[in-house]
């Protein structure tokens, strides 16, 4: 959460805000204070030292989320500076993709369960590949980086994704790493 003591702060959003933020903006534009205060994940500074914080909202069906609007961003600027996670990237033209949210683990060093919850939710392979194929075409991508913390949790989805990625023919990696006990015998074959 941003600095709640900052006097320039009126509203904020905690958790997954894709849909809640839109509700908040609509309520503000309609000057509807009652609706503003009902928005899931709303953080509002009431007065010095007092805050209103609503429970956040989880997006259960990640396929409802639109593809990232990368066409509205200066992607060439990102590519120029090499804004990516892995020190071993093979290209500066990196596409960062999230396939899932959540993690069933409770690692003391990690904020993923707090941010995304402990139930892992996956986008469909088709939804993921739609994003990848469009952005590979539009931005001449040279490498794909999956930023999921638990991309190897769901074997069925991972196998399906790997089958589709093979046809794309680009190198890919998981710069956030994977949990060692999620690895399984066939996984080495998939990473080749």
What are these regions (language model features)?
Residues 1-58:
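Glycine-rich beta-alpha loop elements in corrinoid/cobalamin-binding modules
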Residues 63-64, 69-192:
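Radical SAM [4Fe-4S] cluster-binding motif and immediate context
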């Amino acid at each position: 959460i941003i600095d709640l003591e900052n006097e320039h702060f009126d509203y904020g959003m905690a958790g997954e805000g894709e849909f809640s933020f839109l509700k908040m903006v609509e309520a503000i534009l309609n000057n509807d204070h009652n609706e503003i205060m009902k928005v899931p994940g709303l953080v509002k500074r009431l007065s010095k030292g007092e805050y209103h914080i609503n429970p956040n909202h989880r997006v259960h069906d990640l396929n409802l989320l639109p593809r990232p609007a990368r066409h509205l961003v200066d992607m060439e600027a990102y590519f120029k500076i090499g804004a990516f996670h892995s020190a071993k990237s093979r290209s500066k033209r990196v596409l960062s993709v999230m396939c899932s949210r959540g993690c069933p683990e409770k690692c003391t060093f990690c904020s993923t369960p707090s941010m995304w919850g402990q139930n892992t939710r996956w986008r469909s392979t088709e939804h993921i590949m739609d994003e990848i194929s469009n952005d590979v075409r539009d931005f001449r991508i040279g490498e794909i980086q999956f930023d999921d913390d638990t991309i190897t949790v769901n074997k069925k989805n991972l196998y399906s994704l790997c089958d589709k990625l093979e046809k794309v023919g680009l190198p890919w990696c998981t710069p956030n790493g994977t949990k060692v006990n999620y690895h399984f015998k066939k996984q080495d074959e998939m990473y080749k």
